[in-house]
């Protein structure tokens, strides 16, 4: 029996396949040395998934590729900053064997972040913080300056609601992130010729750059 599914269910399945294939490609290209996570949205659910993966299945990897492409925003820049800015200060040892590094609830190894033209709102702010705090390199294409926060308003018809930008984010130099385009450290375009072949040039570039960083350290 063939049971039809909704368009949203189809999109969810395609997304999961894309993430799985991206993770498999990173494992293949790095020889198992790197892990891969995609931040689907700047929200609690996505954060829990990323947290679980980097400190769980990828705990023994030498570094992590953080993918923020196609992320529509939310509010997670502070959490991502804290999570990926860990600096090792102790190693727990049990009976002569290393158990874990500390801090044990933050990521202490090298990382790299991929971004793209479809990043929006906090998916602009998060890569900005990542670069501003010198946490790692940015790979991909420039992200439009869309980092604002909105106030959600509902009209008399509750099915009609919209967000009004009311919060700007100003740097110490007095520049607002809104309308300030963010440029990657490594500019790589996913050409349509390679996209239709299933090739992700931005992902490949991120793996190459992170491995070079690890090998030179």
Describe the predicted segments one by one:
Residues 1-157, 194-202, 208-215:
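Cleft-lining beta-strand/loop regions that shape enzyme active-site pockets
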Residues 119-121, 156-187:
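Metal-dependent DNA phosphodiester-chemistry modules and their immediately adjacent helices/loops
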């Amino acid at each position: 029996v063939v049971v039809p599914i909704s368009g949203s269910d189809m999109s969810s399945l395609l997304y999961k396949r894309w993430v799985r294939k991206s993770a498999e490609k990173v494992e293949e290209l790095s020889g198992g040395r790197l892990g891969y996570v995609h931040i689907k949205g700047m929200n609690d659910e996505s954060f829990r998934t990323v947290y679980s993966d980097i400190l769980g299945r990828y705990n023994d990897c030498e570094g992590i590729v953080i993918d923020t492409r196609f992320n529509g925003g939310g509010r997670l820049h502070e959490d991502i900053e804290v999570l990926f800015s860990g600096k090792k200060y102790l190693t727990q040892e049990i009976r002569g064997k290393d158990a874990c590094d500390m801090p044990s609830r933050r990521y202490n190894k090298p990382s790299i972040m991929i971004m793209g033209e479809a990043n929006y709102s906090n998916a602009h702010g998060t890569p900005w913080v990542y670069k501003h705090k010198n946490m790692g390199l940015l790979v991909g294409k420039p992200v439009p300056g869309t980092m604002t926060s909105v106030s959600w308003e509902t009209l008399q018809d509750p099915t009609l609601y919209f967000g009004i930008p009311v919060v700007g984010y100003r740097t110490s130099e007095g520049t607002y992130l809104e309308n300030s385009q963010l440029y990657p450290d490594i500019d790589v375009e996913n050409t349509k010729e390679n996209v239709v072949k299933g090739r992700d040039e931005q992902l490949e570039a991120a793996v190459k750059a992170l491995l070079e960083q690890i090998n030179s350290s």
